Amino acid sequence: MKPYMARKLPFEKEIDYNRIAKKLIAASSSVSKLDGMLEEENISRELFINPLTKKEAVLSSQIEGTQATLTEILELEADEGKTDSKNKYDDFIEITNYNKAIEYAENEVLDKGKISLWLLRNIHKLLLNGARGKDKNPGEFRNEQNWIGKPGSTIENASFVPVPQENLTEYLENLENYINDFEEQSELIQAAIIHVQFEKIHPFKDGNGRIGRMLIPLFLYYKGILSRPILYISEYFEENRDEYYDKLNAVSESTEGWLEWIEFFLNAVETQANRNIEKFKKLQNLYGEYKGIISEILNTKNSIYVVDALFKIPVFKSTKLHEEISKSIDIDIGTVNRYIRKLVEAGVIVPEEGKDRYIKYYFKKLVDLIQ
């Protein structure tokens, strides 16, 4: 199979906005509502955003073949990454790296005011640090031809062969210019095009899918459409994985293929923006509910710090909960253990079964909500 020579951006022919108008309006409206919620002062990153960012990391990684669930990642965090399963440990590292990479990217875009090739390389370096792809030149664009196919496939029977390495620089520079120096009529349409173009270029030896999906909220954040790079779209892509790949693969010189991809993308954006709005509302309601419940159970002015800690680490060991609460107040481990016993007796948290020491505890209401 010959390498795919992607079209340079922007397109010479305009996109048929009449055809996609309804979907675009609906998706834009949902994103606007989501951003309005993100701008509220009571939407705390640590309490409400980080749990869903972890879920996005899990789902984006699952599209690439990881198996770990969000609950398993939370358990591994409580165990500080200790596990007898190499696969689980590798999944844990990949997902942890994803979280670090998106937070780093947000700060860099805010600081530098652009999405540069330098930034993409640094995101890639963070993503692959100590992970399965650590031998795939983390932080470096590929210097040889790659291809996509089933395990063991060759370039001759590959399902897709990206841009040749000798053309990589010109395509990446074209993409960088399109991201930073060009404005489509709609930023959502531009995000859809950027995602496809990045995947068609496939500039890294590994990690292209995750970075390509990360680029979607990052671009909307850069353009000011989102006040934070929060548009957890991987859930929709994972649920519709076959269609996601079919639509990506169908994009070529054909205008129809592009339009079908854009329609699919706008459906994903609208669906996930609405889901995220509902999820944030449920998280806020749960937080308000348990502020009252835990205050009544513990009967102490420290209860608010306990609630905050449970939202930050919904699966924990007593020492970790003590460490988290101690970031806000001076408190001894004995007092924290007393709080834990009361919360277990009240059914607010559930202890790990079958262990007498170093027990993990689960704030099940929150775990179930974000899972």
Predicted regions, residues:
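FIC/Doc superfamily catalytic core
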Residues: M1-Q371
